[in-house]
Amino acid sequence: MKNNRILALSGNDIFSGGGLSADLATYTLNGLHGFVAVTCLTALTEKGFEVFPTDDTIFQHELDSLRDVEFGGIKIGLLPTVSVAEKALDFIKQRPGVPVVLDPVLVCKETHDVAVSELCQELIRFFPHV
């Protein structure tokens, strides 16, 4: 791979079994330079496993910070809200030649369902770009 810079649009898994921790570890093991824009945080609370979306403004600032980086690939993981998904889609649309992998999380292993009804419709909009 000529360009070894890979971007993960991923959530933070507090148990490090998935999300951005796993993405960055995989990139490192394969000699790639990983970048990340955090889509959400997670926590195990009295309510169970919870997903806390990154504030829209903060997520946009993350993407804006990466605007001038040329990536060899982009991997999309957990997109917790329609607005975060829209921002991610706008970002990848600006990079038409960059390979994109869409690996969405729709149901967390810990049995907490991420709100998916509107989000599924938004994810369909990614298909022409991945």
List the predicted regions and their residue ranges.
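Small-residue (G/A/S/T)-rich helix-start motifs and N-terminal tracts that mark the onset
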Residues: 1-73
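Conserved residues at beta->alpha junctions
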Residues: 10, 78-79
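Conserved beta-alpha-beta core of the PfkB/ribokinase-like small-molecule kinase fold
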Residues: 76, 82-130
